[in-house]
Amino acid sequence: MSWTTPKKAILLAASAEGSTKLNAFDNALLKMGIGNVNLVKLSSVIPAYIEWIDELPKNIPVGMLLPTVYAHIESDEPGSTITAALGVGISEGNEGGLIYEYSGYCTKEEAEKMVHKMVEEGFKVRGWKLKEFKAAVAEITVKDRPVAAIAAVVMLPY
């Protein structure tokens, strides 16, 4: 197999219930449109000049390996609120960027604040200038079934 530098990326987030925590995770992936592919977990560097898209292509083959940065959390504790978040920082001139993940028992606002802080620090230590920050956040509260929250950046080779 050969890898190529991704050309496009999309920021996604979803939450879902399921009969088990794993089923809740799978259901959230399906909601995002990435439940029938294989996610290859990446660390958090965005390639230069990547194009950000708003919608997944319709022609992604079942079982395709998709480079993905993601945060996730599952719970079956009634009354608990869980959140997964990704913060994306894009440099001036789109010459690269960073993605930071966070998940925990917290609100959407707390999680987004955390990833924003992480992105700012990541840029600072590299001496990069942050042009744009965006976030994907999913929050859900457990009722009577297990739940999952996922935030992801999926990178596409085409």
Swiss-Prot record:
Pfam family, one: PvlArgDC
Catalytic activity: L-arginine + H(+) = agmatine + CO2
Organism whose genome encodes this protein: Thermococcus sibiricus (strain DSM 12597 / MM 739)
Primary gene name: pdaD
EC number in record: 4.1.1.19
GO-annotated biological processes: arginine catabolic process
Top enzyme class: lyase
Protein name, entry field: Pyruvoyl-dependent arginine decarboxylase
Record Gene3D superfamilies: 3.30.60.30, Pyruvoyl-Dependent Histidine Decarboxylase, subunit B
